[in-house]
Design a protein with these regions (language model features):
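A structural feature that tracks compact, well-ordered secondary-structure segments
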Residues: 153-155
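Nucleotide/phosphate-binding catalytic cleft detector across ATP-hydrolyzing
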Residues: 1-36, 42-147, 159-168, 172-221
Length: 221
């Protein structure tokens, strides 16, 4: 069984970096990751030992069902995040890796790479999202599931290698759509409403059918 404590501890460190970026040395080697999500665009910076240094994100609606639908908007947000991080760290970032939903590289991988490079970053690697997550989790035999804003992506591993990737169109936005319809509110209001822990007990039975759909996707994998 995979021990998730190390991964969870690293994520806690990353969360702290959002408001408290770490100091870096002049000339220090840094690694960047850019994620264009359905709900958020995120830029993460790590040091040469893989420790979080900075993290910035912005709510965005530039991706639908795992595909970029607003290229200019995506470029603008990515550029702002890069400038914000560079200003905080006092360095110029030069390279990054990007993550995309499984089975979308032929359709959208080049677009995501172009978004990254529009900021002045050289894109050095493209990963499918569950495989990228597994670089931190470290499972050798099993499945890594990424329930994103627009899709649910799954990478199946055997002996540490990816043997199958699956991506289907059900994710967080579908939870919001169901909630918006049930409560008679706008999609944006539903997005905010569902994130409030005080509403979770009320929201759960409303979105249970959507949870069942995600469960079915995972079971089929």
């Amino acid at each position: 069984m995979v021990d998730l404590k190390k991964a969870n501890d690293r994520l806690e460190e990353l969360l702290d970096c959002v408001d408290h970026p770490r100091k870096v040395r002049e000339g220090q080697r840094l690694y960047c990751g850019l994620d264009l999500g359905t709900a958020f665009i995120v830029l993460v910076v790590l040091d040469e030992d893989g420790n979080p240094v900075d993290c910035k994100y912005q709510f965005a609606s530039v991706v639908k069902d795992g595909m970029v639908v607003d290229y200019v908007g995506a470029c603008d947000i990515a550029r702002r995040l890069k400038e914000q991080v560079e200003g905080e760290l006092g360095v110029e970032l030069d390279e990054c890796a990007v993550a995309i939903p499984p089975e979308t590289e032929a359709l959208d991988g080049g677009v995501v790479k172009n978004v990254a490079e529009s900021t002045g970053l050289e894109c050095t690697a493209v990963f499918d999202e569950p495989t990228a997550a597994n670089l931190l989790i470290g499972t050798t035999d099993g499945a890594v599931v990424d329930i994103g804003g627009g899709t649910t992506g799954i990478s199946v591993f055997k002996d540490g290698k990816v043997v199958e990737c699956i991506d289907e169109s059900t994710g967080g936005t579908h939870f919001s759509l169901v909630l918006a319809g049930a409560k008679g509110m706008t999609f944006d209001d539903a997005e905010v409403y569902k994130r409030n822990p005080e509403h979770h007990r009320e929201v759960l039975p409303i979105v249970s059918p959507t949870i069942d759909k995600v469960t079915t996707i995972i079971e089929r994998a």
